[in-house]
Each structure stands twice: as C-alpha cells, then as structure tokens.
A protein has these predicted regions:
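A short alpha->loop->secondary-structure connector
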Residues: 66-68, 123
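Catalytic nucleophile-loop/oxyanion-hole region of alpha/beta-hydrolase
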Residues: 72-81
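Conserved hydrolase catalytic core segment
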Residues: 100-101, 106-128, 134-135
C-alpha cells in the first residue's frame, strides 16, 4: 500500500483476498481496510498478494509442468522465506522502496516477521498477528497428523486424486477439524 501522504508503502499479508466495498465476497480484512478504517484507503494503497503455491491462483501442486502433467507431490517444498522473496520481487517490479506496514495473521504474520528479518530497511512497521517466530514441536506434530489424515483418505491417490476424478474430502474435513481444535486450545490452555 502506498502512503498517499508521505510516500511510503504498506503491505497486507494473508490470502490475497482483501476484498473491499466493491467486492461482494467478504474478505478477512474487511473490518480493517477501507475508507476511514484502521488501514485507511484514503491514505494508503493496499497491496495484498497471493503466495506462490497457494490454492488462491498461483502456480502450485495442481499446476501443470512443461509436459502437461500436474506437479502434484513433485512441486517444490516452499518456506516462508520463499514467499517473502517473491513478494520482494513484486515490490521491486512495482518500484516500491519501503513499505509503511507489512501485516498478516498466522502464516501471513510469519511472512511479516521474515520481511523484518530479511529486509529491515524496506519495512517501517510490522504487524504480526497470531504467529510465532518458531513453530512448537506440538504444532509440528499436529500438522503432521493433519497431513497423514489427508494422505490416508482413500480418495487421495498419493496426491494424484484429480487424475482419478476424486477429491480427498473426508481427509480434508478431518484435518480441518483437528486444525480448529488446535486453534481452540490456544485460547483455553494456561
């Protein structure tokens, strides 16, 4: 987001869908982004990006390679630093020298933190929401259980489910339920 008043930038991180008044689909940030809201679009231009490999429209495991076959499990493993590097490329392409704010929740918060570490001179402020600098061993274990539940779904087919016109809906549903339990535990544990 370009600061219309002082010439610095701002960036929002989460899914790329920040929405807005002209969008019928409610976005994660609707309560915060807009005219006279916390992130005031009278003052700031908002840049909301899609992560490489995400399900929101970039190249990812379901994209096809040069031979016309889906990458599936052959898509490269990505890390937070990879997403920040692609965002930096976008900033360079847009001519953005400094963000006023890099903000995000959960994985977006981890990216905000990575921006501060990798490019501290490009970031005036960082907003880190519901994110940690390091993933706990419990969280790593629970994430692996979620992945295993999806892999064990009979319709997963080693990640090639679309070739069989299937979708691992049961595994995804169970993994999502487990994920929601972990969110609740964060608020109920001491």
């Amino acid at each position: 987001i370009y600061d219309r008043l002082v010439g610095s930038e701002m960036c929002i991180r989460d899914s790329h869908h920040a929405a807005g008044e002209r969008d019928n689909n409610i976005g994660w940030w609707d309560e915060f982004i807009g005219h006279d809201k916390t992130i005031d679009t009278n003052r700031f231009f908002v840049v909301s990006v899609n992560n490489l490999g995400s399900c929101f429209g970039s190249s990812g495991p379901l994209s096809k390679d040069k031979n016309g076959k889906r990458f599936n499990n052959n898509f490269p493993q990505l890390e937070v630093i990879d997403w920040v590097e692609t965002q930096k490329m976008l900033a360079d392409k847009l001519g953005i020298k400094k963000w006023h704010l890099v903000i995000g929740g959960s994985l977006g918060g981890m990216q905000s933190l990575q921006w501060a570490v990798s490019y501290p001179k490009m970031v005036k402020k960082v907003g880190i929401l519901a994110a940690a600098a390091k993933t706990s061993s419990q969280n790593i274990a629970l994430n692996e259980v979620e992945r295993e539940v999806i892999r064990k779904d009979n319709d997963f087919y080693d990640g090639k489910y679309l070739e069989f016109n299937k979708s691992p809906v049961k595994g995804l549903k169970a993994a999502r339920m487990l994920g929601h339990i972990t969110y609740c535990l964060l608020y109920t544990s001491d």
